[in-house]
Design a protein with these regions (language model features):
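Local sequence-structure signature of Cys/Sec-based thiol-disulfide redox active-site neighborhoods
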Residues: 1-32
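Hydrophobic beta-strand residues in large extracellular and virion-surface proteins
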Residues: 5-7, 58, 98
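Conserved short-loop catalytic and cofactor-binding motifs
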Residues: 8, 34, 46, 86
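Conserved residues at beta->alpha junctions
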Residues: 11, 37, 93
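Thioredoxin-like thiol-disulfide oxidoreductase module
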Residues: 36-54, 59-65, 100-105
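Non-catalytic, surface beta->alpha helical segment in thiol-disulfide oxidoreductase systems
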Residues: 62-112
Length: 113
């Protein structure tokens, strides 16, 4: 299965989106960016998955798809999704969390991860 990275984002500025884009650009990782403030279906998907409109939410999808290739691990009700590795999904990560998640999914190789 060919994997693709999809980032759910919004058009207005967000520090976590900036961090994620910086890491993805640093490693030359291609990704598709879906803007939840322009796409109502994407907005609803994000609410279903995360419980919040938290961006960025990154998913590993099959090539050409917009949804995770496998069901993300569930979140405890009311728990913030920030930085929690849910397998095929990661929301609002810091740079270190994102690098570890990307390494786990073989998008990059990071020493010590």
């Amino acid at each position: 299965m060919a994997k693709e990275l999809v980032m759910y984002s919004r058009t207005s500025g967000c520090p976590y989106v900036t961090i994620s884009k910086k890491v993805l650009d640093e490693y030359n990782i291609p990704y598709r960016e879906i803007y939840i403030d322009r796409d109502g279906e994407a907005r609803e998907r994000l609410l279903d998955w995360v419980g919040f409109l938290s961006v960025p939410t990154l998913v590993v999808a099959e090539a050409g798809e917009l949804i995770p290739y496998e069901e993300p691990e569930p979140l405890e009700r009311g728990l913030s999704p920030r930085g929690i590795d849910r397998g095929s999904m990661l929301t609002e990560p810091n740079a270190s969390q994102l690098k570890q998640w990307l390494s786990h999914h073989a998008f990059i190789t990071v020493e010590g991860v």
